[in-house]
Amino acid sequence: IKRVEQVRDVFVFCIFTGLAFSDVKDLSPEHLVKDNKGELWIRKNRQKTKIMCNIPVLPVAASILEKYKNVAECTGKLLPVFSNQRMNSYLKEIADVCGIHKNLSTHTARHSYATSICLANGVSMENVAKMLGHADTSVTKHYARVLDQNIFKDMQKVNSCL
């Protein structure tokens, strides 16, 4: 089903970038920058805080961007993003079908990025804060407190169902 595929792709993109829903919905080509080594970055002010995020685009996220590069419904934006309410409703549907008993939401992806992608792999608290657009590490420390290997196991279940 096309809508389920799009919701999955946006969710996975957020897991690999840490972008909040409002920021991924607003993501446009102007936010993509190549550095002097040819590496792709997302450079964008967070909608919520207006703080600049600098996020390296990992291969999984890059492949999702490539997939939607010429999709008509993305005109002016990089991804086909439904409303937050619809996204969360579809994520609940996906979780039910996959037998996931965790409440999946667009914000779950941001937490997964901070914990399973970054902190669990040794990225410093300061760098995670910068990528998430936090003013300092006090908010980021909240993510570290919820670091739990069960998040990774749950995401593996999602991946095997999608």
Enumerate the predicted regions with their spans.
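C-terminal secondary-structure termini that scaffold catalytic or DNA-interacting sites
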Residues: 71-73, 158-162
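Alpha-helix N-cap/helix-start motif at helix boundaries, enriched for small hydrophobics
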Residues: 10, 22-27, 128
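Catalytic-site neighborhood detector that most strongly recognizes the C-terminal catalytic loop/helix
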Residues: 46-50, 62, 84, 132-157
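Short, basic (Lys/Arg/His-rich) helix/loop patches that form interaction surfaces
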Residues: 1-7, 70-77, 81, 89-130
